[in-house]
C-alpha cells in the first residue's frame, strides 16, 4: 500500500486540529492513511469514514466521573499487566504509574511508561479506595464520597491493583 506524504503547508495549517497517533502510546504499531492525512482520509477511501477525533480518544485518554455518591477514574492501560502498574494516594492526589521494561513484539523491541496524577475531591473516603484492572485492559479507580463535615482520612498509601476476568463496563469512546 502506497501512502501519500502530506505537504508541509497542509501539516502546518491543520496539524493542531488533527492530532496524530505518532506521539501517543500506540507509537510503533504502524500507521494508517488517516494518521498522515486525517482530513483527506474520506477522499482516499470514500466509503470509509474515520472519525477525526478517534485518535485522541484511543490514545489512553482517561475518563473521570464525580457524582454525588462516588468518584471514579477509567484509564485504558491495555499494554500493562497489574504487576506493571503502581497506584498511590498522596494526600489529595492519586498517582497512577505504569512501566514495562523493553520486550520484543512484532516490530522489534518496545518499552512503555506513563504517569498520571489526579486530584481527589476533598470528600472522598480515602480508606475505602479500590483499583481493578478488567480483562480488556481498563483500569478502574474508585472511592465512595462521605457527607460534608466527616473526615475523609487523608494519608499516603499504595492501592493494590486487582485483576478482573470480565471486560470493563466503562463506556468505550
Swiss-Prot record:
Residues where Deamidated glutamine is found: 6, 50
Sites carrying sugar chains: 162
Binding site for Zn(2+) 3: 154
Domain named sHSP: residues: 52-162
Modified residues (Deamidated asparagine): 101, 123
List of residues binding Zn(2+) 2: 107
GO biological process per UniProt: actin filament organization; apoptotic process involved in morphogenesis; embryonic camera-type eye morphogenesis; lens fiber cell morphogenesis; microtubule-based process; mitochondrion organization; negative regulation of apoptotic process; negative regulation of gene expression
Modified residue annotations for Phosphoserine: 45, 122
Keyword Glycoprotein part of the UniProt annotation: yes
Binding site for Zn(2+) 1: 100, 102
Post-translational modification: Acetylation at Lys-70 may increase chaperone activity. Undergoes age-dependent proteolytical cleavage at the C-terminus.
CDD domains per record: ACD_alphaA-crystallin_HspB4
Residue ranges, annotated region (Required for complex formation with BFSP1 and BFSP2): 1-63
Pfam family, one: Crystallin
Biased composition range(s): Basic and acidic residues: 153-167
GO-annotated cellular components: cytoplasm; cytosol; nucleoplasm; nucleus; protein-containing complex
Role of this protein: Contributes to the transparency and refractive index of the lens. Acts as a chaperone, preventing aggregation of various proteins under a wide range of stress conditions. Required for the correct formation of lens intermediate filaments as part of a complex composed of BFSP1, BFSP2 and CRYAA.
PANTHER family: ALPHA-CRYSTALLIN A CHAIN, HEAT SHOCK PROTEIN HSP-12.2-RELATED
Assembly information from the UniProt record: Heteromer composed of three CRYAA and one CRYAB subunits. Inter-subunit bridging via zinc ions enhances stability, which is crucial as there is no protein turn over in the lens. Can also form homodimers and homotetramers (dimers of dimers) which serve as the building blocks of homooligomers. Within homooligomers, the zinc-binding motif is created from residues of 3 different molecules. His-100 and Glu-102 from one molecule are ligands of the zinc ion, and His-107 and His-154 residues from additional molecules complete the site with tetrahedral coordination geometry.
The protein's name: Alpha-crystallin A chain
Organism: Neovison vison (American mink)
Amino acid at each position: 500500500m502506497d501512502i501519500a506524504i502530506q505537504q508541509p503547508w497542509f501539516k502546518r495549517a491543520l496539524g493542531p486540529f488533527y492530532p496524530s497517533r505518532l506521539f501517543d502510546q500506540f507509537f510503533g504499531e504502524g500507521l494508517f492513511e488517516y494518521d498522515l492525512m486525517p482530513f483527506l482520509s474520506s477522499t482516499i477511501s470514500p466509503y470509509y469514514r474515520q472519525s477525526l477525533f478517534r485518535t485522541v480518544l484511543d490514545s489512553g485518554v482517561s475518563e473521570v466521573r464525580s457524582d454525588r455518591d462516588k468518584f471514579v477514574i477509567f484509564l485504558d492501560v491495555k499494554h500493562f499487566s497489574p504487576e506493571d502498574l503502581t497506584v498511590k494516594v498522596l494526600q489529595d492526589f492519586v498517582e497512577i504509574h505504569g512501566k514495562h521494561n523493553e520486550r520484543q513484539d512484532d516490530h522489534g523491541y518496545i518499552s512503555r511508561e506513563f504517569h498520571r496524577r489526579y486530584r481527589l475531591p476533598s470528600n472522598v473516603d480515602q480508606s475505602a479506595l479500590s483499583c481493578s484492572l478488567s480483562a480488556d485492559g481498563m483500569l478502574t479507580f474508585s472511592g465512595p464520597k462521605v457527607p460534608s463535615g466527616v473526615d475523609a482520612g487523608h494519608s499516603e498509601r499504595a492501592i493494590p491493583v486487582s485483576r478482573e476476568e470480565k471486560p470493563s463496563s466503562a463506556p468505550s469512546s
